Amino acid sequence: MSTSADGAYHKLSIPAQTHPSGCPIDHEFTTFTPDYLENPYPQLAKIREEHPIFYSKKLGYLVVTRMEDLREVFRDHDVYSSENVQDPVFPICDRAAAILAHEDFNPVAVMSNRQQPDHTRIRKHTQDGFSGRRMKILEPYIQRRSQELIDAMITKGGPVDFVSAFGHPLPGQIIFRFIGFDEADDEQLMSWTGNRLAFTWGNPDEDEQIDIAEKMMKYWRYCRTFVASRFKDRKDDLTSELLNAHEANSEELSYREVESIIYGHSFAGHEIVSNFMSNSLLCLLQQRDNWDAICKDPKLIPNALEEVLRFESPQTSWRRKTNVDTHIAGVDIPAGTQVFLSLGAANHEPSLFDSPAEFDIRRKNARKHISFGHGIHFCLGARLARLEATVAIKALAQRIPSLRLVDGQALDYSANITFRGPKALYIDWDK
């Protein structure tokens, strides 16, 4: 693993944590209980009102729940470092750590977990790849693949699992074409990105950790091989744009940084958007009048999707670490404190959103959510995620307006601290 000044992409050693003096302690709060996984929002509402900032003994994190405080943490990037956002939540076993300590596994921190001033330098070049021109180039592909996946569902006949038939493959295919990956590798790439979710944000057992570590190594080697091939043969894709920037000025963007950006983007652009699509369909179909409304008037879709991001965000938390001693909302916080930012709690804050537990596709301030972050680390792919979801939901509403949820299904959610979306979502329609 990299030991360069750039910093490793994943840091595997987790320093021991103690609760800040004078801060309330919750000995039971964790994101891994069945009740939290089924529906975290009642619990988040309770703790936000009783102790908006508290220390979770089980997670080893200071938990922040109010929108005002979250925005302050995101804004003050000199005090609150993002260096820990790609690190495993819990310690990993020695055998898994040894696999990732190999000199061949050396991605460096680049976007979500890189400190200033390097973050802005790297983001500037990566942002060029998310231009309006590239969105226009990609949109016809999104439309075509949406229609093809709908065709496949109709041909197969319902009921079908929306996640495996549409919600999971479509975002993967889009981000992989955006990066430039070979379509023949899609299935393997999708498997690798799911493994990274469990490793970094979940709590896998030792055997799972070892298996995931081996696959992460293969995934990193794949990314490096792919970038090397693009270096020799440029195309009209994100990787080629990054390599062009590197060649123009290697001090502005290093070759290893290009490799590491590709390693990170193929996960971020897949899992988060997959959850976004599945959560969107779930929320819209749970109340039939909402689905009927967007079928009748597709102009409602963009705001409805913002309400999904507020009400059932695909990313319910993020992390930070204090660089220096600081304080927030009257709580003194020592340097080195791990901070858990509860986006889900803030997005349901009643002082900001009327009747926050209600899903309202016409909510006027739905876009005030914080699901894409805030400040210099605001999600670079937000525009693409919104485009994908808008095209997909519009296509589904036009092609299959009789869509409905299969009655009696119990939704199962992946046990992790950050990402939220059903593992399966069964739907049916009139034949």
Where are these regions (language model features)?
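Cytochrome P450
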Residues: 2-431
